[in-house]
């Protein structure tokens, strides 16, 4: 087990991976293309997915520029909305960025009515008129706050005709950059929040949360960060952030690798051990590579990996044990682990064998221009 210093870096890495566009490095003007995978015939596959509930979920950000292909996703989680709190009193929530961006995503339901769109809430602050980060902690200290938040969520879902709420509180009881938190009560209060959401939204809308990978039972017997067992009765599924689990020279999203601090298999097993059914678990796929948590570049989008200077880096090196590719320098040093169609296929097959619900990815715009990874996720889920 690595020390607390590494754990804090791991948490910081998850925050970068889950809530922001990773840094890019210098690029070759003519990137070497990936082989564009043939996509499984979408309509028949989608009909089958609808009947058995499989998930191919894309996180789509407010700062992205692309409009997703509505026929190679089953779910879109729109990132993000943020909470407004003043002196401990809930004031409401707002979308981050421009409303027009969100509305353009919602409009995709006109071409594919089966598409599910959920609004994802962040603990962070991006809007210039909002001053308090970490507002989940303050929100959850008042039953009235939580009730009014849930009512606002319901009104928003009805207004836009979308399908659910996704919560991305990273993480209860932990402070980032001075964000409000209360380690004594945040974990338990998070359960109360999803309970209130379920009571208000009923069974007509989906509720999910972004699951932390290294949560475990603390020495006191309680849970640190997220009480995954306590949350389970109130959520439809968990989007497990199986990425940013280590840094170079290890893989950050290995399928199974005892050399890494954590891997996908161990993260999923923690949820199964807590009593969460496999068919409520969605495996996370990063569309970026992780180099470091503290040194530049910290992370590199997939499209930038393809554009790395081929005279300085070798990509598509394969690690059989981790079932993931990596980039190495021409001197043979491990630069970053990442995912490609081969590793996504392996993860999809593993998830199906475990009886999991499907795959999700962060995030749509980090793929290459051909949509190589998006198509690979769709194919892996629809096999």
Task: Give residue ranges: language-model regions.
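Substrate-binding surface in catalytic domains of secreted glycosidases
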Residues: 57, 86-100, 172-312
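Sec-dependent signal peptide recognition
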Residues: 2-9
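Bacterial signal peptide processing site
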Residues: 20-23
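C-terminal motif of bacterial Sec signal peptides marking the signal peptidase cleavage site
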Residues: 15-18
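Glycan-recognition patch characteristic of GH18 chitinases/ENGases
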Residues: 32-157, 256-261
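Glycan-binding loop/region signatures in secreted carbohydrate-active enzymes
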Residues: 41-43, 127-134, 279-350, 370, ...
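Surface-exposed amphipathic alpha-helices with a cationic face
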Residues: 46-51, 102-118, 122-125, 191-207, ...
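Conserved, mostly hydrophobic/aromatic
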Residues: 76, 119, 167, 197, ...
